[in-house]
Amino acid sequence: MTTEKFKILSEYIKDMSSETPNIQTYLFVKDSISKYHLNIEITSEALKNKVIEVNTSLKFLDKDSSEKKATFEMTYSSVIKIEDEIKDKKILQKIILCDVQNKIYPKLEKAFLNMLTNSGYPDIAF
């Protein structure tokens, strides 16, 4: 087993939003939410001394042209420290895009599903 080449210093929900404009939209979305799509975007920003902020954004939305839509978004931020010997850009990309994501996914998924449940849309799984 290989040792991790990074350490998560901190992680938190940076932004979270659930919008259902009215009861008609809620009733419509409740029946059509299975058609919604989950988009994932990962960005990173070097801070200092091998410390990087990794933002993982989830957007759960209707791709159809329906007028009755609800939107659900969350940005989960992880602050990581990379080992000093990491110089290769491909290794750094793998850490940010794969390794960090695998590590944070259980918390990220739980927070996002809790938001959906608390917004009136239980029993959704990814």
Which residues does each predicted region cover?
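N-terminal intrinsically disordered, cationic/polar leader segments
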Residues: 1-126
